[in-house]
From Swiss-Prot:
This is Histone acetyltransferase type B catalytic subunit. Disulfide bonds: none annotated. Component of the HAT-B complex composed of at least HAT1 and HAT2. The HAT-B complex binds to histone H4 tail. GO terms for biological process: cellular response to reactive oxygen species; DNA repair; DNA repair-dependent chromatin remodeling; double-strand break repair; negative regulation of pseudohyphal growth; phenotypic switching; subtelomeric heterochromatin formation. Keywords: Acyltransferase, Chromatin regulator, Cytoplasm, DNA damage, DNA repair, Nucleus, Transferase. The active site is at E269 (proton donor/acceptor). It holds the Pfam family Hat1_N. It comes from Candida albicans (strain SC5314 / ATCC MYA-2876). The record marks W182 as: Interaction with histone H4 N-terminus.
Length: 413
């Protein structure tokens, strides 16, 4: 930048730390709306700036990446007080980031960015997709849109959003949005203020892939096609986190897929711990109200046919349904439900752990094998109780039901 000092790298050779900046700290993200610019920091920057997540050769470096709350049009600005000039390790920051941003990104000229956003809106910008669901939470209203990736505006919106995948999902990568099997769902917060222009704000998004499932020879010639939905990327902007919106977003999407006959299963690609937590709690709450799920059937001797039939009806993948059954068993154990013993629950969970790790355990002697299984079980039990927290499941004891029946009979007399 012309306003910054340019210095020879020889002068900095003995003090490289003064010219080295954490890229996680230098990159400052903003979402701007008519009232404020909301700031948040990235979790990762290594996909852009390398594994060390550092930038060498600049002093007092700040990288500003801003997005409009509605169109998500990006603005990039880079500021520093001094820059080294003759070191091959020094990167061109703008050129480096440009590889991950759409061509519509405005650089440095903030007035031009504001004018370009206004121009888009004046030309009738609308959310490029179909409204598929709505919900309310904490006196606010939210809409879920399925974005039309075949349209120019839909594809462009994805191009604007996708850099967040690199910044907030470990090992995240871009998808081929031109592949027709990819779907993009975006969550918006509606603006119902009488003094505003009623523009919604992007809260988060998820990408999901449709996998066609071979139905077997009997159904192969059928006109009905079955598919699996695989959730690939799932992001709630940090400025909206901590409000339960991710869980609601996931649950409302799952309910939509549950109602579609052509979708037979919903799976998740390499979920991290935070998404596992969100998913476990959301799925448990769905089971709480599902007419297809019988909590009484969940015992350490649960019928395998019931498990498979119920899992298919609920469109849950095997690993996830097994986790839910184990969590429910521990819930029953914790609350003293009859017929549930700690030993039986422990053996039930250990069996799945053993089957999952059979090859690795096969080379160990019996004592080591038992120790490994016990350690794995204890860690899982602790994690399940953490996930349960203060969640209340809709499970009635048999004596509770008998008491209810007695009261009902007395009322009829």
């Amino acid at each position: 930048m012309s306003s910054a000092k340019e210095q020879s790298s020889v002068t900095a050779a003995l003090q490289p730390e003064q010219w080295t900046t954490s890229s996680n700290e230098a990159l400052k993200l903003f979402v701007t709306n008519p009232e404020a610019a909301l700031n948040f920091q990235p979790t990762f920057t290594y996909p852009i700036f390398g594994d060390a997540e550092t930038i060498y050769g600049y002093k007092d470096l700040d990288i500003f990446l801003c997005f409009d709350h509605y169109t998500f049009k990006p603005f990039l600005n880079i500021k520093y007080s001094a820059k080294l000039t003759d070191d091959p390790e020094i990167i061109d920051i703008k050129k480096t980031i440009d590889e991950f941003l759409p061509k519509s990104t405005i650089f440095k000229d903030e007035v031009k960015w504001v004018d370009s956003i206004k121009e888009e809106k004046d030309n009738g910008y609308k959310i490029p997709g179909k409204l598929i669901d709505s919900f309310s939470e904490n006196d606010k209203e939210y809409d879920i849109y399925k974005i039309d990736l075949k349209s120019d505006n839909g594809y462009e919106l994805h191009q604007r959003l996708q850099i967040l995948v690199l910044l907030f999902i470990e090992a995240g990568s871009f998808i081929d949005a031109k592949d027709e099997l990819w779907n993009l769902y975006v969550l918006y917060e509606k603006d119902n203020k009488s003094t505003s222009n009623n523009e919604p704000s992007i809260v988060g998004f998820t990408t999901a892939y449709n996998y066609w499932k071979y139905p077997g020879a009997k159904k192969f010639d059928s006109t009905e096609q079955e598919s699996r939905i695989k959730i690939s990327q799932f992001i709630i902007l940090p400025i909206y986190q901590g409000q339960g919106l991710g869980q609601l977003f996931y649950s409302h999407l799952f309910d939509k897929w549950l109602a579609q006959d052509d979708i037979i299963e919903v799976v998740v690609e390499d979920p991290n711990e935070s998404f596992d937590d969100l998913r476990d709690r959301a799925d448990l709450k769905r089971l709480n109200t599902s007419e297809q799920f019988d909590f009484k059937a969940v015992t350490p001797k649960v019928d395998k046919e019931w498990v498979e039939k119920t899992r298919r009806a609920l469109k849950l993948e095997k690993r996830q349904f097994a986790r839910l059954l184990e969590i429910i068993l521990l819930y029953k154990l914790k609350h003293g439900y009859p017929g549930i013993t700690k030993r039986d629950v422990r053996l039930f969970i250990k069996k799945r752990l053993y089957d999952k790790n059979k090859e690795g355990l096969a080379t160990l002697d019996d004592n080591t094998k038992k120790d490994k299984l016990q350690t794995a079980y204890q860690a899982l039990e602790d994690d399940y109780y953490r996930i349960l927290g203060d969640l209340k499941l809709n499970i009635k004891r048999e004596n509770d039901e008998e008491e209810t029946d007695t009261v009902s009979k007395k009322q009829k007399v």
